[in-house]
Structure formats: structure tokens, C-alpha cells
Curated annotation (Swiss-Prot):
Assembly and interaction partners: Monomer. Interacts with kinase MAPK1/ERK2; the interaction is direct, occurs under hypoxic conditions, and promotes its interaction with PIN1. Interacts with peptidyl-prolyl cis-trans isomerase PIN1; the interaction is direct, occurs under hypoxic conditions, and targets the protein to the mitochondrion by promoting interactions with the TOM complex. Interacts with mitochondrial circRNA mcPGK1 (via its 2nd stem-loop); the interaction is direct and targets the protein to the mitochondrion by promoting interactions with the TOM complex.
Modified residue annotations for Phosphotyrosine: Y76, Y196
Binding site for AMP: A215, K216, K220, G239, G313, E344
Modified residues (N6-succinyllysine): K6, K48, K191
InterPro entries xref list: Phosphoglycerate_kinase, Phosphoglycerate_kinase_CS, Phosphoglycerate_kinase_N, Phosphoglycerate_kinase_sf
Residue numbers binding ATP: A215, K220, G239, G313, E344, D375, T376
Keywords: Acetylation, ATP-binding, Cytoplasm, Glycolysis, Hydroxylation, Kinase, Magnesium, Metal-binding, Mitochondrion, Nucleotide-binding, Phosphoprotein, Transferase
Protein name: Phosphoglycerate kinase 1
Gene: Pgk1
Binding site for CDP: G214, D219, G238, G338, V340, F343
Length: 417
């Protein structure tokens, strides 16, 4: 799925117009301080383009966290983002305490030329996602008439619509698909992300290696299935490797992650790999722990020895890392989605860190390396490798759905050209 037939910001006339722009400012916070501003920085080129080309105003809307339709300004306000944005843009940002309604509409109706406005969290209204919880935590659904009113109010805030929220492109939420304006364009971040993935999936450099980690096989079935039609090699690591090893090698896995649902299709996936000539690399040794805890006792195990009862594998061992390094060394293009160990804890981070080092090395020799958002992007931030790989996606779920071969609703909703 590419943007080739969709309107993009560089082709949009913004002069004298009010631009309403969906961005992804869902940034990690600690005590109301932003801990990683990657997503805010990523939206700056689109915002600057509008201002440099004479837009009357740029009204920015985003979600933050999961307030589930309940206003929680103490916990999930976008106000700290306004200050961060001001320093990145070098100009004032007007923060509004809501995202819809008469007061917001008035503030956005006729602002001074070149005004930047940031709306409060879209998800303080249940109409953004269409469902949520009430103040007591009971599940609620938004009424269709109220969803229509919410979307109509958002549509009054601009003359043209730009969507630069790649991280939310896989969600059919009101701000993504429900703004009703004659021109709806993809922003520069959206364009960059889709171009990278389109090229990677439609005309890859070969050998093409996918590195797939993470916990559950069932969550990654479609991903593995779709990628088996595209790649030459695949590393299957992380927690989901144990399901494969138990089914294929009858390995004793102790209390390691095991996915009953996923286990049923392991053999089908392996026979598809064989049919397509895809070389699969699984881990052969492990760093184990006596409980799921940062300070657990640690041990070592191999596929042959098995993992003793009551113990679990939380990282791959050095032999596995060597095998992974060989696969990376053969590749001319790599897509990596999911860590191969519990990288958040020092004792179980070595496998993912050594793999990251190899991917950085591969990049420096000209291999195209794409990091598919989410936890793997967090690894790049943690080890400072964001500018040492070809592309770090800003969207975990969105990049996953692209790699699964799905159409993204947020892209689908843009104007055709």
C-alpha cells in the first residue's frame, strides 16, 4: 500500500487556508515530562511547510494515552506537548482546553495569520474511538448522532485536512476518517513511512531478511504468513520462539511463554517456509530466569538440554546471537519487528543489544534496515541507534498491519488523485 494515488501535502495549496492536521503526539510521559519527543519532532516538517507556504492557521489534533473517552487532564493532557512544540518550532503555540464545541470553533474560526493551535486530547471524548468507559469504568458505546456531531465540529476547524499521524493510521477513528473537508492530504511523515514500507515490500533488495520477535505467535501469525511470501530469510526470536521449539523439537521449555493457539499452525508456517525456500533461524540457546523479575536468578540452557521446570527463557544466548549475526551478514535488506529478549532488564538485554549492533554494522555497509516501531523503536532510542539505521518507524501497530498486507483506514480516507 503506497501513497502513489493519494493527495500529499506537497501538492496541496495551503495559502491563506486554515489547515486542520491530525498528528501523533502520543509521547511517553513521566510526571508530566516528555521522555521521548521523537513523534513531536517527526511532525515538524509538515507543520513548517504549511506556515512557510502562507497557511492562515495550523490546528493540530492528537490523542495521548488511553483515557477511554473520560477527560483526565491531570494524567493525559497534551498541554506539556504545546511547550515542547513551541521550542521545536520557535514560535508560540496556542493550547485549547478542548478539541470540539463552540469555544474551540470560535478560537479556530478566524485566527491571526500564521497561528499554531494545539487542541486537547481527542480521546477525552468517547466519540473519537466510538467506544470507551464511563467514569466508573463500565464499557460504553458512543451514540451515532453524537459521533456525527463530534466529526462535524472537527471539520469546522479547518478549510483543508492533513493527516500526518502514521502511528494511528491503522485505526478508523473519527479524527482519522471522519473529517469532512473537500481536500484531505497525507503529510510528509505519512509519505516517508509509506514510501519506505512500499519499497521494502513491493521491490525489496535481496537477500531480504525479516527479524520477528515479541511474545505471542497468535499475534504475529498474519505477519509471519505475509512475510513468508516476501523474504529470503527469517529470524524467529523472542518469546514466540518457544512455541516453535516445543512443537518442532519437542523442547522442554519450563514456564517460558507458550502459545496454545499459535502452536496449532507452527507446522503449516514451517511448510510454507520450505515451499517458498525461506531459511528460518530459531534460537539454539537461552539465558534463563527462575521468575519473571528483573533481579531473578539467572541460568543457561540449550534446545538440547531444555529449560528446567519452574524456569523460563528471557533472552537468547551467545550461540543464537552468532547465528543471528550470520543471517544479518547475508542480508541486503532487513525489516525488524520485535525484540529477541526482555531488553528492558539489563540481565536479559544482551541478545537484543548484540543483534542491534549487527544491524547497525549492516547499515554502514549499505544494507537497508527498517525498524518497525513499537518496542524495537524503543530499543533504538535506548541504545542511541535511531540515526544509525535506515528508518525507524513511528508506528508500531500501523507498521505491523502494513507488513501483514492490510489496508490502513487512515490512508484509505485521503483524497484520490
Amino acid at each position: 500500500m503506497s501513497l502513489s494515488n493519494k493527495l500529499t501535502l506537497d501538492k496541496l495549496d495551503v495559502k491563506g487556508k486554515r489547515v486542520v492536521m491530525r498528528v501523533d503526539f502520543n509521547v511517553p510521559m513521566k510526571n508530566n515530562q516528555i521522555t521521548n519527543n521523537q513523534r513531536i519532532k517527526a511532525a515538524v516538517p509538515s507543520i513548517k511547510f504549511c506556515l512557510d507556504n502562507g497557511a492562515k492557521s495550523v490546528v493540530l489534533m492528537s490523542h495521548l494515552g488511553r483515557p477511554d473517552g473520560v477527560p483526565m487532564p491531570d494524567k493525559y493532557s497534551l498541554e506539556p506537548v504545546a511547550a515542547e512544540l513551541k521550542s521545536l518550532l520557535g514560535k508560540d503555540v496556542l493550547f485549547l482546553k478542548d478539541c470540539v464545541g463552540p469555544e474551540v470553533e470560535n478560537a479556530c474560526a478566524n485566527p491571526a495569520a500564521g497561528t499554531v493551535i494545539l487542541l486537547e486530547n481527542l480521546r477525552f471524548h468517547v466519540e473519537e474511538e466510538g467506544k470507551g468507559k464511563d467514569a466508573s469504568g463500565n464499557k460504553v458505546k458512543a451514540e451515532p448522532a453524537k459521533i456525527d456531531a463530534f466529526r462535524a465540529s472537527l471539520s469546522k476547524l479547518g478549510d483543508v485536512y492533513v493527516n500526518d499521524a502514521f502511528g494511528t493510521a491503522h485505526r478508523a477513528h473519527s479524527s482519522m476518517v471522519g473529517v469532512n473537508l473537500p481536500q484531505k492530504a497525507g503529510g510528509f511523515l505519512m509519505k516517508k513511512e509509506l514510501n519506505y514500507f512500499a519499497k521494502a515490500l513491493e521491490s525489496p533488495e535481496r537477500p531480504f531478511l525479516a527479524i520477528l520477535g515479541g511474545a505471542k505467535v497468535a499475534d504475529k501469525i498474519q505477519l509471519i504468513n505475509n512475510m513468508l511470501d516476501k523474504v529470503n530469510e527469517m529470524i524467529i526470536g523472542g518469546g514466540m520462539a518457544f512455541t516453535f521449539l516445543k512443537v518442532l523439537n519437542n523442547m522442554e521449555i519450563g514456564t517460558s511463554l507458550y502459545d496454545e493457539e499459535g502452536a496449532k499452525i507452527v507446522k503449516d508456517l514451517m511448510s510454507k517456509a520450505e515451499k517458498n525456500g525461506v531459511k528460518i533461524t530459531l534460537p539454539v540457546d537461552f539465558v534463563t530466569a527462575d521468575k519473571f523479575d528483573e533481579n531473578a536468578k539467572t541460568g543457561q540452557a540449550t534446545v538440547a538440554s531444555g529449560i528446567p521446570a519452574g524456569w523460563m527463557g528471557l533472552d537468547c544466548g551467545t550461540e543464537s546471537s552468532k547465528k543471528y549475526a550470520e543471517a544479518v551478514g547475508r542480508a541486503k535488506q532487513i525489516v525488524w519487528n520485535g525484540p529477541v529478549g526482555v531488553f528492558e532488564w539489563e540481565a536479559f538485554a544482551r541478545g537484543t543489544k548484540s543483534l542491534m549492533d549487527e544491524v547497525v554494522k549492516a547499515t554502514s555497509r549499505g544494507c537497508i534496515t527498517i525498524i518497525g516501531g513499537g518496542d524495537t523503536a524503543t530499543c533504538c532510542a535506548k541504545w542511541n541507534t535511531e540515526d544509525k539505521v535506515s528508518h525507524v518507524s513511528t508506528g508500531g501497530g500501523a507498521s505491523l498491519e502494513l507488513l501483514e498486507g492490510k489496508v490502513l483506514p487512515g490512508v484509505d480516507a485521503l483524497s484520490n488523485v
